Amino acid sequence: MTTVNSNIRDNCKREKAARFLSENLCPDAVLSVASAYFTVQAYDQLREKLDAIASMRFLFGDPDYVNKIDPEKTASKRFAIVNNGLDLKDALRQKAAVKGCAEWIRAKVEIKSVINRALLHGKLYHIAPPGRDSRAMFGSSNFTTRGLGLADSQNNIELNMEITDQRDRDDLL
């Protein structure tokens, strides 16, 4: 698929949201994220870059969102696992990814939650590299494999914009 040169990241013709992170994350950077969802699989695919950052500040949607997705707890767990892109061949690798992610969170991540009746909808990725201007992207991509365009197939079609004005990037924090 050919890509279009643009500051839009849509996981289709205008690059993947993950590319913004991969190209801009660097050792000792501070990453600030606002997202309603976070998956270990997304961390695992960006692990090399994320392990090298100084810290991450994560503004998370209501932590009770899991219960809101299936309040009657009727959804098939098998379906949920398959729908999230997991299968048996990944089970052993997933255990190591979960352990690595937990260690990374304990060492580098500060998590704050939005406790409100309304859901956190806006997403933000702000990178402050040492000694350089910050970088930022905001839009619709959650910190998930499909949201960031990291899935092998069926990535979400998103609408994110890389912010090119330094004043606007500073205002986002």
Please place each PLM-identified region on the residue numbering.
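PLD/PLD-like phosphodiesterase catalytic module centered on the HKD motif
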Residues: 1-173
